Each structure stands twice: as C-alpha cells, then as structure tokens.
Amino acid sequence: MFHHISVMLNETIDYLDIKEDGIYVDCTLGGAGHALYLLNQLNDDGRLIAIDQDTTALDNAKEVLKDHLHKVTFVHSNFRELTDILKNLNIEKVDGIYYDLGVSSPQLDVPERGFSYHHDAKLDMRMDQTQQLSAYEVVNQWPYEALVKIFYRYGEEKFSKQIARRIETHREHQPIETTLELVDIIKEGIPAKARRKGGHPAKRVFQAIRIAVNDELSAFEDSIEQAIELVKVGGRISVITFHSLEDRLCKQMFQEYEKGPDVPRGLPIIPEAYTPKLKRVNRKPITATDTDLDENNRARSAKLRVAEILK
C-alpha cells in the first residue's frame, strides 16, 4: 500500500493563492495529499496536471483522487519535461506550479525499491523504474573519481575518497549486490569516531547515489527554469526541499530571477527587459509546524520557498 504523509500540506497549496477555476501543476504527485487538498478548492472548470515518474504513485493517486478524476490529467514523466507536457495538452500558461522534492515514504520504506539503508534489498533507487541506470550500475561500474565526486558534491561526505576506495576494492572481487552490503562497506571507510555522530553513517552516500541515479538536481534546475516561463503573471511557484543542496539551488534561482539583468547606467526609464521576472513571497524559508513534526519526523528538514511571477 502506497501511504505517504504530505509535509506542509496546507502552506504549500495556500501560498499558491488558489483560483477555483485555475489550472495548476503538481510536479511530484507522490501520495497525492497536496493534490487532494488543492482539488477540493477547484470547481468543475479547474484543472490539475499531476506528474510523477513513479507508476506506483500514479496508480495509487487515481484511487486517492477518485472523486475528482474529471479535473485531473495524470502524466507519467519526469518534471524536467514540463514544457513538452503542457504543450502536448495544448496549455500555454498555468496559474501555479508546486514541487515536493522529498522521496516519498513508500519509496523509502518498501525494501524492494532499494532506497533505504535500514533494509536489505537489491541496489536500485530508481524513481522511474522504467529507466536503465540504477544504484547497482553506479556502485559497481562508475570509476573511483566519479564516485568521489558524487559523494562529495551530492552527499557532502567528508570521507568520500576513503569510501570510494573501499567500494573499488570490494567490487574487484565480486559485485556489490545489496543495500546492506554497501552499508557495511561505507562503514569501513569512515573512522569509528566519526561513525558515532551525525546520524546513520550511510545517509550521505545513499543520498548522493540516489541523486546521481535520478539526476535530481539537474532535473529540478531544468524544471524550475521552465516553470518560471509557464506560470501566468500573478501566479506562483511553491517548492518544498528536504536537503541543503536542493534548498540552495532553489534559493539561488529565485534570487537570480528576482534580481533581473544588470541595468545600464544613465537610462531615464528602466526597460521591461531589465525588470525582475519574479518576486520571492517569503524571504526566509517556511519550516514545518509542530503538527507536521508530530505526524512525520521527516518534516524536520523541510523548507518551503514561494515565488510570484511578475511578467
């Protein structure tokens, strides 16, 4: 059963300033909690485009949203294809777009998906189970230098070199097949003192591999750039992030589009081309409430950023 508790559900949707006949895009449908809350605010002229690359999530969402199916278009795709998705639906502009970038609880908790360092399973970590690249290929086939790079860049792991070297040594004898095999190897690469602090010792490397397998940061950057062009003037974009890499990227992109191009000196009037594309609705990220934390301890790291389109 696909059961997922949506984080900051009300805030994410309420900040979109919902119009009851508007067109909205859920880029990360997941457990459909945000979608259901939004659909309850739309009349029969409103519409939701619901995107997910996980077919299990889409199948579950059709059941969760069964009372609103006439208002929903389900799309099995990666959100980096946002422009093409809307073009294929003959939609030029929408009233709002939102993202929940967390890995859904079922993906983490179902051992067979290979995301969790708590359960033994084959190395997988594919959000889209139709794609070829999995964690198995990354761990067993990527060169030492590439592993060091992703562990450091995507996992901010200070022992990246030591862990990558351990992986390289082990796979010379036999392939690394399962999540718990990998956990043991990661532990070998981290000094005992360091293993006792900072959460689970495999957390950062598993995050890094997951991001690499699913090309998450690049896909998000591509998608946000498209979203900024696809939302109507006055429409909004809501983004929930769960780790510093995503949050930093979101913050930087919103700041860049809020700043606009450098204005040449001496102009009596600032041309529209030099005015900001958007404004940040909240200067600092919104964090989870005590209620969110009581329901879902994964909400502790969640941050919500919202931007409004100006032109």
Curated annotation (Swiss-Prot):
Name of the gene encoding the protein in the UniProt record: rsmH
Chain positions recorded as S-adenosyl-L-methionine binding sites: A32, G33, H34, D52, F79, D100, Q107
Protein name: Ribosomal RNA small subunit methyltransferase H
Function: Specifically methylates the N4 position of cytidine in position 1402 (C1402) of 16S rRNA.
Gene3D superfamilies: Putative methyltransferase TM0872, insert domain, Vaccinia Virus protein VP39
Coiled-coil regions listed: none
Pfam families referenced in this protein's UniProt entry, alphabetically: Methyltransf_5 (PF01795)
Enzyme nomenclature, EC number: 2.1.1.199
Keywords recorded for this protein, A-Z: Cytoplasm, Methyltransferase, rRNA processing, S-adenosyl-L-methionine, Transferase
GO cellular component: cytoplasm
GO BP of this protein: rRNA base methylation
Family named by the database record: Belongs to the methyltransferase superfamily. RsmH family.
Main localization (coarse): cytoplasm
GO molecular function, one term: rRNA (cytosine-N4-)-methyltransferase activity
Protein's cellular compartments: Cytoplasm
Enzyme class (EC, first level): transferase
InterPro entries from the UniProt entry: RsmH, SAM-dep_MeTrfase_MraW_recog, SAM-dependent_MTases_sf
Catalytic reactions of this protein: cytidine(1402) in 16S rRNA + S-adenosyl-L-methionine = N(4)-methylcytidine(1402) in 16S rRNA + S-adenosyl-L-homocysteine + H(+)
